[in-house]
Amino acid sequence: MYAVVVTGGKQYKVAEGDVLFVEKLTADVDSTVELDNVLLVGKDNEETVVGKPMVEGAKVTAKVLAQGKAKKVVVFKYKPKKDYRKKQGHRQPYTKIQIEKINA
């Protein structure tokens, strides 16, 4: 069984046991989160249910494995011949989750 869920403005195709890095969720480590925005639920050799826009009553349960930050991205601006340089770094926060159950 698989599902397509929306979290953090992005869509992910998930199956039970998958480990994902998603945009930061406000949840503690080792807690469970429910992803309610399910766009599609499919089973092997059975009919696929597509939501309009969401599948009613479908939920995906996941366990939070870790909270962290991604690698640093360096943003460097400069203007030639004008002695203007600006260096800035950014580390995007993420949540590592493991899909436990898909309820359709």
From Swiss-Prot:
GO terms for molecular function: rRNA binding; structural constituent of ribosome. The keyword Amino-acid biosynthesis does not apply. One of its GO terms (cellular component) is cytoplasm. The keyword Ribonucleoprotein applies. It holds the Pfam family Ribosomal_L21p. GO terms for biological process: translation. Keywords: Ribonucleoprotein, Ribosomal protein, RNA-binding, rRNA-binding. InterPro entries: bL21-like, bL21-like_sf, Ribosomal_bL21, Ribosomal_bL21_CS. Part of the 50S ribosomal subunit. Contacts protein L20. HAMAP family: Ribosomal_bL21. PANTHER family: 50S RIBOSOMAL PROTEIN L21 (PTHR21349), LARGE RIBOSOMAL SUBUNIT PROTEIN BL21M (PTHR21349:SF0). This protein binds to 23S rRNA in the presence of protein L20. Belongs to the bacterial ribosomal protein bL21 family. This is Large ribosomal subunit protein bL21. It comes from Clostridium botulinum (strain Kyoto / Type A2). The gene is rplU.
